[in-house]
C-alpha cells in the first residue's frame, strides 16, 4: 500500500519533561519518527516543552515549538499551523492524553485534524479500564477478576465481595502513577483516593492480585493491511506485582516453553489486531508458572519504554517504522534499515541475551520508600548484551554506576540471616544483591523461590555466578579459571577482589594469556543475512566482527543511565559532539550503556559499542580501535571519573587535560588558582576528619555549606547551622578520608547565576549568562534559570565575563566549561568551576542558536574560535526571555521530602519563552504542570527567618484576590503587622481544620512552606508538603519561586479602581 498523498503536514506531540515513568526513550522515539516522516516528504511540526532533547533541535522537524504541552497551547499551535494530521503515539502517556483532550474538547473535529497510528477508539479501549475489560471478554482473553470504580465506596464494596490482596490501577496514568497493592481496607482507601485524584478521568481498576505470576511482555507491530509481527518478547526477572520499569528484564524470554510462547504470542497479535493499531504496541501478560493459565495485564497502544528497549535489544527501529506505517506504508514495503537487505516484515532473531536493569534514585533519596510495587520508582535504566544470562547480567550490573562491579555490595556479609531474609521478602531495589548473598550462605533455590516467586531458572543462574566466585577464591591466579569466569561476564575488578590483587595485575595477566574480548554485531537476524550495521557488543568468544577502518577515529564516552543530577542533557551533548566529529572528517565511535537514548541509536555514529562505561570495558574498545583520542567532556561525571585511570594507561584525553581537571576539582589546587587569578570565593576549608570539619566551621562561622568533593547533582550536600548537625553529617552522610575530603564553605545568601563557556586556550565564547530565580542554597539544577539575566547590572556582567576569561585561560580549558557564581552585596564570588559540559548546555544552545557541543568539539579537535561566526566573549543577548524550569517526580517517591536545598531533586526540565519575563514564567510554570487559579486560598507556614519577607509576599497575593491562611506562628506575625489571616492547624490540632485535611478537601490552592536548617526533619511540615504533592496542589519551598508565580498571576489580573 503506497504512502498517503492526501496529507502533507503532520504534527507530532512530544512527551514533555523527564519524570519517573517517562524518560529519554521518548526523545529517541520522537527523533526517529520526525526524521522518518521527513524522509517520506511530509512537513513535520513538533510540539514539546523539553529543551534538553534532540527532537527539539531545529533540523529534526520542519517547525519546532518548545511550548507547554497543555490543551491551551497545543490548541493555539494547531490553529496556527493547521496540520492535516496528528501523530500522538510517540509522546508517551503525555501525547496520548493530549490527543484524548483535543478530541473531547472538539478541537480535532473543528480543525479537521486526523489522528494517525492509533485511532481514538483504540486509545480508549486500551486506556479506559472498562472498555479494555469489555474488549478482552469479547476476544476471550483472560483478565484478572476486576471492577471499574469511580469512587472509594465502590472500591470497598468490590473488596468485600472478593477479598484481598488487590491491585489498584488508575486509568490514563503513567508508570503506574497512583496505583499500588493493597492487603487491607486502609491501604485500599488510601491508594484509591490518590489514584482517582491522579486519573484524568477519575477512574480506577480494582483487580484481584496475581502477584507471583511470571510477567512477560510482547512488543508487536501492525500495519493497515493487517500484517502483524512480534518484534521481541521479554521476561521480567521479578514476578507480577513489581512494575516492569523497576524490574530486571531479559530479552528474549528465557523460561517459556514453545507452547507458552505460542500461546502468549497469539494473544498479543489478536489484541493488536482487535484494537486496529497501526504502529507499535506493548502487551503485558501474566503467566502462571505451574500451568498454561495466563492473564492479560495491560496494553500500551503506543511506543513505550519497552519499545525503546526492544529496539536496542534487537536493532529493529520500532519508532521509525511505526511512523512509516502511520502514513500508510506496510511492513512488506519498508526495507529494514539495519540489514538493508530484508524487509521490516521479517521478525528479528537474537543469538544473544539482553539484560536491562533499572537505575534507582535512592543514592540521592535515602529517606525514600525503597519497597517496589506497581508504581514505578526508577529514574533510568541500563542494558547489556552477552552470550549468556550470567554475562549480560554482570555487565548490566557494572553499568549501573552505583559503586559495584559485581552482584556484591559492601558490608552484606555482616548482615544477620533474619535481616537478609526480610530484605529478600520485602522486594526492595537492591534485592538482587541480597539474593546473591543468600546463595553464598547456601540457602536453597527452592527456599528463595518460595520467598520471592522468582523463577528457579534465574536463581540457578545467580548460583552459577556464586559458585564461580568460590572457584576463583580457591584457585588464585589460575588461567583456565580466569578464562571460564570471563566467559560468564566477571569483571577484572571483581576477579582482582577475589584474588586479592589489583585490577591492573588481572588485566595484564589476561592480556598475556590472550584472553581478550571479541565484538559481535547486533543485526536483527542472528547472522542469517548480511548486515550493514556498526552496532557491537563484547563477549569472550572466537570471531571478532568489528572491523577496523583506515580512517582516523575519535571515541566519545556517553553518560550511562539517567539519574538525578545526570539526565538526558548529557546525551544531547554527546550526540552533537559526534555530529561535529563526523563533520571534521574523523570516524566517530560512541560507547554507552543506556537503551533509552538517541546516542545509542545505531544511525548516529560510525560505530556504536553498547558496553558498560568502566575502565576495563573502555580500555578493551581502545585497544581494538586505537582511536586518535577520547572525548570525556560530554559524558557527565561518568566519563570524567575515568580520566585518571585512562590517563595513567597512556590514553590521549582530548580537550582539558587531567592535571587541569584536577585543579578545578581538587579543593586546595582550586583555591590556589583563584588566589593567583585574584578571583574571590566564599571562605572555605577542606576536612578529612570530623574534628577538622568542626574547626573549619568555627573559623568560617555558621551557617556553612558542606559537601564531598567530586560529585554531580549536589549529592550529600547540606547547609549546616550548628556543630551538632555538622558532627551528625560527618558521621552519617559522608565517609571522609584523605582521598575523599569534605568541603566546608561559608554559605552566602545571595543571587546565583551561571555561565557555560567555550575556550580554545586563547579566547573564549560565552553564549549566555543565566540568572537563577531562587537565591543561593537551592541546587542550580532545581532552580529556575532566566536568560538573558533580568536584574544584573552591567558592572556585574562585565565582572562575570572577566572572571570567566581568567578561569578559562588560567585552568587551560579546551572545550566546554561551566562556572557558578553567587552575588552578595554587589560582589561576585565563584562557587565552582566544572571543566566539562553541564546540564544547561541544551537550553543555552536552543535559546542562543549556538550549537555549543559542536563548536566545543571542533575546538577540542584543534579548531579556533576565530574560525566561527560567533565572535569572542559574551554573545549578544536574545530579545526574547527564556526560562528553564525544573520538573520533579515526587508523586512517585513516597517518603521523599520535596523541600528544595543544595542537593538536587528534579528529574527533568521544561522551557518557557516569550517577549517578557511574566509571559515566559507563565509558560514555564504551565509546562512544569504548576498551575494556579487567579484566586483562591493560599497557606503560609514559614520559618521565623522568613516571616518578614513572607509578610510582603502574602500582602501582594491578597491584593490580587487570594485569601491568606496561616499556621499559628506565621498568623500571629502577619496579624501583628496588619494582615488579616485565617488561622489553621498543622497536625493533631483537633480544635480546627488542619492543613492536610483542607488540602484533601480542595480548600487550598497553594502552599508556601519554608523551613530553617534546624527544623528540616520537622514531621508536621513534612506531612504538609507530602499532602500538597499527593493532591497536586502547587507547593513552594522557596519564597523566590512563590514570588515568581505572583508575577505571573499579577500579569493576568486586571486593575480594579474606584472612580475618583
From Swiss-Prot:
Which positions in this protein are listed as binding Mg(2+) 3?
A: 820, 832
Gene (name only): carB
- The UniProt record gives the binding positions of Mn(2+) 2 as 298, 300
Looking at the record, the residues that make up the MGS-like domain are 930-1060
Give the start-end ranges of region Carbamoyl phosphate synthetic domain: 547-929
Species in which this protein is naturally found: Streptococcus agalactiae serotype III (strain NEM316)
User: Which residues does the annotation say bind Mg(2+) 4?
Assistant: 832, 834
Cofactor or coenzyme needed: Mg(2+); Mn(2+)
Any one GO CC term of the record:
cytoplasm
Asked if the record carries the keyword ATP-binding, the reply is yes
Instruction: Locate the residues binding Mn(2+) 4.
Output: 832, 834
Q: What is this protein called?
A: Carbamoyl phosphate synthase large chain
**Where, by residue number, does Mn(2+) 3 bind?**
820, 832
